[in-house]
Regions:
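Short, contiguous, pocket-lining structural segments
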Residues: 159
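Positively charged n-region of N-terminal signal peptides that target proteins for export
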Residues: 1-4
Length: 269
């Protein structure tokens, strides 16, 4: 009887452990929430350092504002995927001062992206086909800044380690991207992607993103230092985030063409 009791307890504990493991959908959804949707809105100052293959460095300073809909952090309420708007204001160096990158993330169509060039007083619309191109000369792409729609890829759990869920993501439309697939190493506790590796059709790794520093800000695990390395070009970009703040009450009307030429100073400080 004692052996039977021990066996039943062991089976119960094993079943509980299996039930506790999140599904691939839950992992991907939580990772998207942790990366792009924490808080109802957000603001961060960013220092971007671009290092080319010769070791030459260029620096940019910018501020990122974000607004979400729905304004929730509840996973069951769709917080991991919703309409979202980004306003990226550049302050340094002089040649990019007052330049603005604006994004409207849409659920039922391609995202809308605009770039305001103050020297020309020109608002340039960025085509959907250009989302996988360099963001202001860095190793990050436009899509890296605002995020890739999770429904654009098929997701497969390759393995689980003591720290990470390792996910393989394959595009549903291979012709729309330059990669064959990418792997994400998602932290099991925070659900933040700590490393993302991009592979080409020859199964060669050519691009690597890393979360170099994570801090807890207002209860949200937040990446405050990240890098993107282009292995083929030998270049690397590091982004350092400071003065990060969530739930600031940023109004939606800031994320319009009117504010491309009239920066919302109050929220950029």
């Amino acid at each position: 009887m004692k052996r039977l009791t021990v066996l039943l307890i062991s089976l119960f504990l094993a079943a509980s452990a299996i039930a506790a493991d999140p599904t691939i959908e839950e992992i991907v959804n939580r990772a998207n929430l942790a990366t792009y949707y924490q808080g109802k809105d957000g603001r961060a100052h960013v220092k971007m350092t671009i290092t080319d293959s010769q070791g030459r460095k260029r620096m940019r300073k910018l501020t990122i504002l974000r607004w979400d809909q729905p304004d929730t952090d509840e996973l069951e309420n769709g917080a991991y995927r919703g309409k979202q708007k980004f306003y990226v204001y550049f302050s340094r160096p002089a040649d990019v001062n007052k330049m603005v990158f604006l994004v409207w993330k849409n659920l039922d169509k391609d995202d809308d992206r605009w770039l305001y060039l103050p020297a020309l007083d020109l608002v340039k619309r960025i085509a959907a086909s250009d989302k996988r191109t360099s963001f202001v000369g860095s190793d990050f792409f436009y899509e890296d800044v605002s995020g890739r729609d999770i429904d654009e890829d098929e997701h497969e759990l390759l393995k689980t380690t003591d720290k990470y869920f390792v996910i393989k993501n394959t595009p549903k439309d291979p012709s729309s991207v330059e990669f064959a697939y990418y792997k994400m190493y998602i932290h099991k506790k925070t659900f933040l992607p700590i490393q993302v590796e991009y592979y080409d059709a020859q199964d060669k790794k050519y691009r690597v993103a890393k979360a170099l520093k994570v801090e807890n800000i207002q209860g949200h695990p937040t990446v405050t230092k990240a890098s993107m390395e282009s292995l083929n070009q030998g270049s690397k970009t590091v982004m350092e985030y400071s003065s990060v703040k969530y739930d600031t009450g940023i109004p939606e009307d800031i994320f319009t063409e009117r504010y491309l030429r009239k920066p919302p100073r109050k929220y950029l400080k």
